[in-house]
A protein has these predicted regions:
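Short coil/loop linkers at secondary-structure junctions
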Residues: 1-4, 55, 150
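Short alpha-helix boundary/capping motifs
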Residues: 38-39, 76-78, 141-142
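Short beta-edge/loop segments at beta->alpha junctions of small alpha/beta modules
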Residues: 1-45
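DNA-contacting surface of Y-family translesion DNA polymerases
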Residues: 48
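Short amphipathic alpha-helical segments, especially helix-boundary/capping motifs
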Residues: 8, 21-26, 86-92, 103-105, ...
Length: 164
């Protein structure tokens, strides 16, 4: 596990550890390793689109967790990452994807589309059309049954408009 032992911060810095957040340190200097401070979690939204090759833009890592954490932009190793809280019953729909030497949980295409609507994130229409073209009907319909009614109805309208 890439987290360091706890101890005084001066001693940790001397050993090469970097602080992620209160109580969490790592030896790695890549911002994607900030995730270990927020278990359980998955990468979602724009970051999931980037990691799955659906969006070419470089994005800040977006960590989605059901834990009670402060939402917003944080910094690690002078790079930004975003932490978002999601309801426990909405915490599903991710798979492990290899990233460098680790496997990281990344939301699948169906859940990424749902999360984009849930969090009110706007992405270009061509990205949405590409996502809808790659949706697995069975998986998407099973996810719709897990959602609150208002969100499920909204997702059906969006998918119908894009002619799926």
């Amino acid at each position: 596990m890439p987290l360091c032992e706890s101890g005084t911060s001066d001693r940790l810095r001397w050993r090469g550890c970097q602080k992620i957040t209160r109580g969490a340190y790592t030896f790695y200097d890549e911002v994607q390793y900030a995730r270990f401070a927020f278990p359980p979690f998955y990468y979602g939204l724009e970051d999931a689109l980037s990691l799955r090759g659906l969006w070419e833009q470089e994005t800040n890592p977006v960590i989605i967790t059901p834990r009670k954490v402060r939402n917003g932009i944080r910094q690690f190793d002078s790079r930004n990452y975003i932490v978002r809280r999601i309801k426990r019953k909405m915490f599903f729909g991710y798979t492990l994807l290899q990233y460098e030497q680790f496997y990281i949980p990344v939301s699948d295409i169906e859940k990424t589309l749902i999360d984009l609507v849930y969090f009110g994130i706007r992405v270009p229409d061509e990205v949405i059309s590409t996502m809808i073209g790659k949706l697995n009907r069975e998986t998407f319909n099973s996810y719709l049954t897990e959602l609150p009614q208002y969100l499920s109805n909204r997702m059906r309208i969006i998918v119908r408009k894009k002619k799926w």
